[in-house]
From Swiss-Prot:
Organism: Persephonella marina (strain DSM 14350 / EX-H1)
Name the record gives this protein: Catalase-peroxidase
NCBIfam families assigned: cat_per_HPI (TIGR00198), PRK15061.1 (NF011635)
Stored Gene3D superfamilies: 1.10.520.10, Peroxidase, domain 2
A GO molecular-function annotation: metal ion binding
Length: 727
């Protein structure tokens, strides 16, 4: 043989690029437990004791800002800056990092810095933002672990605004980087860029999605599906920004404020001249995508969206010119050199001509996008736009607040914000909780309060159910929810269907205990929020004693109660669970397999697979089911913390048969010999015996030598959930 062969074919190594998904190809609907194993510590290169909050505190924050400012003003030959300033590019980078947030599930957003990873790094709406991050690399290299990419991208947007004359209201750090793509975020059903399969027959975006097409951050700037329909674009804007959690005023402020800066890039047809996106680019491009073969491929020949031109004659200066020009002129529909629909001013005055970004002395008429004209022609959007036009200071303030909300929405409660520029003002979207101005309870108080709680009319089941109901509203995606604030006693949570079981009774008892304790003359007080957790912990300890073990359940005080006035009812309504497999609850109208929803819930609670297993098994034997059903209560000793759920689920003397009850899959377990009905369970219950990976966990915890191990693991997982919102 003249040609040497290695003895293998490429097919032998496809696992290296398919991510181990060969099993899922055989069984595409099997549970994906990898969702609960993201950012495995073995993947993260930091030392095990690394603490980002501590590292950030060592940062010379204002020196960092100065370095970012210097980078923005130093145009690089490999990617020349428009108008000699990278500010508009950095604003777009920050905006597109934060703008993926959607309020329904809290996913997307700037936290984690997922713009660096697939699929977001390769979306058509993010063309050339890889260059923005490369421009920032010298800064990231210099400051290292003290500043995450997630924080740096947002801070760069802030510095850009400030360097172009805008006064922001501040910045909060604290976003920690992820180290792999997020596989728990649903970006849509489409398999092609800019495809649209996400709208219902009524034209609404289905599910939690906020963007109108695959690969966009929010709306299509050319109009719905690329058609220059201004009023259709207005409808898209309101829905898309609304699902990002923005009001109409905030929406107009963000569009008008953002388009005060920079330009669009469409020197030629992107489908003809742009190479593959970063994830598909050849190895020698080192992660840079969209290589441009038109002309020089940069500067005046840049291709990004395919739209071409700038909005104002002052594209690197904050002013009111975007709105002034929008309302001053009539607009002609034209196509850009790249073939994209846009609007050009009719007979613009000389002083309103836009300077070329790279050729001195050359000028162009200002342009508007279809979505921009929506701010003028849609009555609701136009009313706000005119108010901003007439009152530039009001506009400035509205944009400053909307920008801060956009870039901080998924960072969580204000106590998580880091740095010297955190604004003092509280905003309703931060879910504010008053600061504690009293002395916290001590160990003696905790002991006495536990005794009072356990002597009350509330049962172990009721106390556990209520504590779980409050704590399990937490979602890691945007750090909202949880016990802190005591919002389970406020609207909308107190009226949720799932909270009608046990919760009102327990809250009444705990409020009486709270009022009695707080009558004492000292400065010491206890909040309802702390009492809810303490009651749950006391109940779990009692259940452990009944099992014959003496194991302490940790409790740390420090939660406070908030008010109805500080609670945005509409915003909090999105935290109502469609399903909570831990309480064996699902809304009747939901037809998604319950085990899928269990995995999503466990992911939002930041649980590992073993933690999810012990919590389900433990909550079942404690009887903590919605509506007090017996589903999954595989024990004769309800209220005793034991591994009975797993033992009896795996008992081969029981045979399971499916039935439909109230439009729900229920399974009845019969004694193989007698034919007697023994237990009933849901899909969530039986999945622990059906799924091979979960069965392995169930077998482990069902072992005779792991009875105490099960209890200790339950306590650890319980403690984790109770404290998710304060750690």
């Amino acid at each position: 043989m003249d040609k040497k062969e290695c003895g293998f074919s490429i097919d032998d190594f496809l696992y290296a690029v398919e991510g181990g998904n060969t099993i899922s190809k055989w069984w595409p609907h099997r549970l994906n437990l990898k969702i609960l194993q993201q950012n495995n510590p073995d993947l993260v290169p930091f030392d095990k004791n690394f603490n980002y909050r501590e590292e950030f505190s060592k940062l010379d924050y204002f020196e960092l800002k100065e370095d970012i400012r210097r980078i923005m003003r130093e145009s690089q030959e490999w990617w020349p800056a428009d108008y000699g300033h990278y500010g508009p590019l950095f604003i777009r980078m920050a905006w597109h990092s934060a703008g993926t947030y959607r309020i329904i599930d809290g996913k997307g957003g700037a936290n984690g810095g997922n713009q660096r990873f697939a699929p977001v790094n390769s979306w058509p709406d993010n063309v050339n933002l890889d260059r923005a991050r490369r421009l920032l690399w010298p800064v990231k290299k210099k400051y290292g672990n003290k500043i995450s990419w997630a924080d740096l991208m947002i801070l760069a947007g802030n510095v850009a605004l400030e360097d172009m004359g805008f006064k922001t209201i501040g910045f909060g750090g604290g976003r920690e980087d992820i180290w792999e793509p997020e596989i728990d975020t649903y970006w849509g059903p489409e398999t092609e860029w800019l495809a649209d399969m996400r709208h219902s027959e009524e034209g609404k975006i289905k599910g939690p999605l906020a963007a109108v097409q695959m690969g966009l951050i929010y709306v299509n700037p050319e109009g719905p599906n690329g058609e220059p329909d201004v009023l259709g674009a207005a409808k898209d804007i309101k829905e898309s920004f609304g699902k990002m959690g923005m009001s109409i005023e905030e929406t107009v402020a963000l569009i008008a404020g953002g388009h005060t800066f920079g330009k669009c890039h469409g020197a030629a047809d992107p489908s003809k001249y742009l190479g593959p996106e970063p994830e598909a680019a050849p190895i020698e491009q080192q992660g840079l995508g969209w290589k441009n073969s038109y002309g020089t491929g940069k500067g005046k020949d840049t291709i990004t969206s395919g739209l071409e031109g700038a909005w104002t004659p002052t594209p690197i200066k904050w002013d009111n010119s975007f709105l002034r020009i929008l309302f001053k002129y009539e607009w002609n529909l034209q196509k850009s050199p790249a073939g994209a629909w846009q609007w050009v001013a009719v007979n613009p005055d000389r002083e309103d001509l836009v300077p070329d970004a790279h050729i001195p002395g050359k000028y162009h008429p200002p342009i508007m996008l279809t979505t921009d004209l929506a701010l003028k022609l849609d009555p609701e959007l136009s009313e706000v736009s005119k108010r901003f036009l007439e009152d530039p200071e009001y506009f400035r303030d509205a944009f400053a607040k909307a920008w801060f909300k956009l870039t901080h929405r998924d960072l969580g409660p204000k106590w998580r914000y880091l740095g010297p520029e955190v604004p003092e003002e509280d905003f309703i979207w931060q879910d504010p909780i008053p600061e504690i101005n009293y002395q916290l309870i001590d160990q003696d108080d905790i002991k006495n309060l536990k005794e009072k709680i356990l002597k009350s009319d509330a049962t172990v089941t009721e106390l556990v159910y209520t504590a779980w109901s409050a704590a399990s509203t937490f979602r890691k995606s945007d750090r909202r929810g949880g016990v802190n604030g005591g919002r389970i006693a406020l609207e909308p949570q107190i009226s949720w269907e799932v909270n009608k079981t046990h919760v009102p009774k327990v809250l009444k008892i705990l409020n009486e205990i709270k009022e009695d304790f707080n009558k004492q003359s000292s400065d010491k007080k206890v909040s309802l929020a702390d009492l809810i957790v303490l009651a749950g912990c006391a109940a779990v300890e009692e259940a452990i004693k009944r099992a014959g073990f003496d194991i302490q359940v940790p409790f740390r005080p420090g939660r406070n109660d908030t008010t109805q006035e500080l609670t945005d009812i509409k915003s909090f309504s999105f935290l109502e669970p469609v399903a909570d497999g831990f309480r064996n609850y699902i809304k009747p109208e939901c037809d998604i397999p319950e085990e899928y929803l269990l995995i999503d819930k466990a992911d939002q609670l930041n649980l590992t697979v073993p933690q999810m297993c012990v919590l389900v098994g433990g909550l079942r034997v404690l009887g903590a089911n919605y509506d007090s059903t017996d589903y999954g209560v595989f024990t004769d000793n309800v209220g005793t913390l034991s591994n009975d759920f797993f033992v009896n689920l795996l008992d081969m003397s029981i045979v399971w048969k499916p039935v439909r009850v109230n439009n729900r899959d229920i399974f009845e377990g019969y004694d193989r010999k007698t034919g007697d009905l023994v237990y009933r369970g849901t899909r969530v219950d039986l999945i622990f015996g059906s799924n091979s990976e979960l069965r392995a966990q169930a077998e482990f915890y069902a072992q005779d030598d792991n009875r105490e191990k099960f209890i200790r693991d339950f306590v650890e997982a319980w403690d984790k959930v109770m404290n998710l919102d304060i750690t």
